[in-house]
Amino acid sequence: MNPKSEVLIAAVLFMLLACVQCQLTFSPDWGKRSVGGAGPGTFFETQQGNCKTSNEMLLEIFRFVQSQAQLFLDCKHRE
């Protein structure tokens, strides 16, 4: 693979990553088609009280990763 094609692939991947947005918060009704009212635009609207804020969810994910890393280190020290 020549350097020009590698740069082109990297640029395309970078552009795709810049356009991607992920959902970090999930409500108990995530994935269900019968969410909310039947009016237009209500399918994707968030319901009050079901979702945490982004900061709360990121903190929860961080704590989970931190606890899993600690468990891994504890197992590593036992060996």
From Swiss-Prot:
Modified residues (Tryptophan amide): 30
Residues with Pyrrolidone carboxylic acid modification: 23
The UniProt record lists the keyword Secreted: yes
Residues that make up the propeptide removed upon maturation: 34-79
Keyword Signal: yes
InterPro entries named in the record: Adipokinetic_hormone_CS, AKH/RPCH_hormone
Main location: secreted
GO molecular function: adipokinetic hormone receptor binding; neuropeptide hormone activity
One cellular component (GO) term of this entry: extracellular space
Subcellular location(s) per record: Secreted
Pfam family, one: Adipokin_hormo
Gene Ontology biological-process annotations: carbohydrate homeostasis; G protein-coupled receptor signaling pathway; glucose homeostasis; lipid homeostasis; neuropeptide signaling pathway; positive regulation of glycogen catabolic process; positive regulation of insulin secretion; positive regulation of triglyceride catabolic process
N-terminal signal peptide: 1-22
UniProt entry keywords in alphabetical sequence: Amidation, Cleavage on pair of basic residues, Hormone, Neuropeptide, Pyrrolidone carboxylic acid, Secreted, Signal
Functional summary from the UniProt entry: Probably causes a marked increase in hemolymph carbohydrate.
Family: Belongs to the AKH/HRTH/RPCH family.
Name of the protein described by the UniProt record: Adipokinetic hormone
Phylogenetic lineage: Eukaryota, Metazoa, Ecdysozoa, Arthropoda, Hexapoda
This protein's encoding gene: Akh
